Amino acid sequence: MANVKLFDQTGKEVSSVELNDAIFGIEPNESVVFDVVISQRASLRQGTHAVKNRSAVSGGGRKPWRQKGTGRARQGSIRSPQWRGGGVVFGPTPRSYGYKLPQKVRRLALKSVYSAKVAEDKFVAVEGLSFAAPKTAEFAKVLSALSIDTKVLVLVEEGNEFAALSARNLPNVTVATAATASVLDIVNADKLLVTKEAISTIEEVLA
């Protein structure tokens, strides 16, 4: 099993923590990670685009001129697609771009990105993140003590609201729970800051 250093909130190394190789030590599957990232990015699209077809455009209920005898081309409505101000043919309609991948694929992608962060030495384990009250300055001190000055994803245990509230005003800091962190969140972060309890949760979820 891989060992990573365990720090406290002051940046002092207190011990080490063993990571499950089946989750944090596999060979990253880049193809699977790519598929899951594309899927999750697609799910973020709003899909609210819409245009009016000839039935939705106002007006055009009356035939503009009689069928025969005018010398002009026959027309049934001034809202036909060939008319200025007419309806759009085959335009975009509201839709969901999201699609689901098999659970095994999603789990393999999570294991792959966690393993990649550990292998690249971008996985920082901390004993805990406890705050008496939501204080942005206190959270900034923790990051400074741990020498984290890049885009970071902080993974905490469920119910640690003060950590999330303390970090929400800090640029380049995202807080998520260990059970809900997505592959896209992890890929977008330069470093992971993970509490000891969150590591246990990750191993329970992905075991």
UniProtKB/Swiss-Prot annotation:
- The organism sits in which domain of life? Bacteria
One Gene Ontology cellular component term attached to this UniProt record is: ribosome
Q: Which InterPro entries match?
A: Ribosomal_uL4, Ribosomal_uL4-like, Ribosomal_uL4_dom_sf
- GO BP annotation list: response to antibiotic; translation
Q: Which residues form the signal peptide?
A: none
Pfam families on file: Ribosomal_L4
The UniProt annotation puts the region (Disordered) at: 49-78
Keywords from UniProt, A to Z, are: Antibiotic resistance, Ribonucleoprotein, Ribosomal protein
GO MF term list: rRNA binding; structural constituent of ribosome
Quaternary state and interactors: Part of the 50S ribosomal subunit.
Per the record, the similarity remark reads: Belongs to the universal ribosomal protein uL4 family.
What is the purpose of this protein? One of the primary rRNA binding proteins, this protein initially binds near the 5'-end of the 23S rRNA. It is important during the early stages of 50S assembly. It makes multiple contacts with different domains of the 23S rRNA in the assembled 50S subunit and ribosome.
- What name does this protein carry? Large ribosomal subunit protein uL4
- The gene name reads rplD
